[in-house]
């Protein structure tokens, strides 16, 4: 089987397509292992679908299946277009719902499923948090310095609320910074698309940023996010890192 490694805003993924739908939790752990496998934040498997260009299975590095991954959706869209599974404009099915994406060279824009505010009144460690679903649940707080990111606090909150944890900083009306602790990876990652989206959405709701902003994660790779007609879009570059072949995968 041909496997392709992609990077999107600092998140990396192993992607392939097949006709067989089955549980691939153990395969995800094997392929995503940083020392004994290819190494990635997640495994994406594309499958044919009767109504959409394709559907996907997305697995975190620990083998857990996730409803959605923002940067993963952009990598998957680029893969699908590059390997003839979809045109430049596509729709595909995730556990969170239908995702729309468009590809132009190495830049991909995805429209996320409709976001939901789950809780506005969380107080933890002297900080106010919001729980927001942008395909997967995210806790969001704002700080004056991203060095205030606390991995131990993030791990505790991730387990308490079963959510990803995001620290955001508002630099000005058009620029936001984010650091994210991701469940499934169980560590801080270089980027998280749905986390960046949740942080932007909360800032926009507060009226402290414009409807179109640049968001910068730990990787330093910029993403453009916009909120338009109650729809959330995000756009950025993706990179095909390499292709490889592995026997016994289907």
From Swiss-Prot:
Binding site for substrate: 11, 60, 70-71, 164, 182-183, 193-194
Protein's pathway: Amino-acid biosynthesis; L-lysine biosynthesis via DAP pathway; DL-2,6-diaminopimelate from LL-2,6-diaminopimelate: step 1/1
GO molecular function: diaminopimelate epimerase activity
PROSITE patterns linked: DAP_EPIMERASE
Catalysed reactions, semicolon-separated: (2S,6S)-2,6-diaminopimelate = meso-2,6-diaminopimelate
Site feature: Could be important to modulate the pK values of the two catalytic cysteine residues: 138, 182
EC number: 5.1.1.7
Predominant location category: cytoplasm
Active site, per annotation: 69, 192
Key words, A-Z: Amino-acid biosynthesis, Cytoplasm, Isomerase, Lysine biosynthesis
Intracellular or extracellular location(s): Cytoplasm
GO biological process: lysine biosynthetic process via diaminopimelate
GO cellular component: cytosol
Gene3D superfamilies found in the cross-reference section: Diaminopimelate Epimerase, Chain A, domain 1
Similarity field: Belongs to the diaminopimelate epimerase family.
Subunit text: Homodimer.
Function field: Catalyzes the stereoinversion of LL-2,6-diaminopimelate (L,L-DAP) to meso-diaminopimelate (meso-DAP), a precursor of L-lysine and an essential component of the bacterial peptidoglycan.
UniProt protein name: Diaminopimelate epimerase
């Amino acid at each position: 089987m041909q496997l392709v490694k992609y990077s999107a805003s600092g998140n990396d993924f192993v992607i392939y397509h097949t006709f067989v739908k089955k549980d691939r939790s153990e395969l995800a752990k094997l392929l995503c292992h940083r020392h004994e496998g290819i190494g990635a934040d997640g495994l994406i498997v594309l499958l044919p679908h009767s109504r959409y260009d394709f559907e996907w299975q997305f697995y975190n590095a620990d083998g857990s299946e996730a409803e959605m991954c923002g940067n993963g959706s952009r990598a998957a869209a680029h893969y699908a277009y590059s390997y003839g599974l979809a045109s430049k404009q596509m729709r595909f099915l995730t556990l969170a719902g239908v995702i729309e994406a468009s590809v132009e060279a190495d830049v991909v824009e995805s429209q996320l499923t409709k976001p939901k505010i789950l809780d506005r009144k969380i107080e933890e460690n002297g900080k106010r948090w919001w729980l927001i679903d942008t395909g997967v649940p995210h806790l969001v707080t704002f700080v004056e310095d991203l060095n205030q990111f606390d991995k131990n606090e993030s791990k505790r909150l991730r387990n308490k609320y079963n959510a990803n944890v995001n620290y955001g900083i508002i630099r000005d009306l058009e620029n936001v910074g984010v650091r994210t602790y991701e469940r499934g990876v169980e560590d801080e990652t270089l980027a998280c698309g749905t986390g960046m989206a949740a942080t932007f959405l909360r800032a926009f709701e507060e009226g402290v940023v414009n409807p179109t902003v640049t968001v910068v994660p730990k990787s330093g790779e910029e993403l453009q996010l916009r909120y338009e007609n109650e729809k959330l879009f995000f756009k950025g570059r993706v990179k095909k890192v390499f292709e490889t072949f592995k026997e016994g995968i289907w």
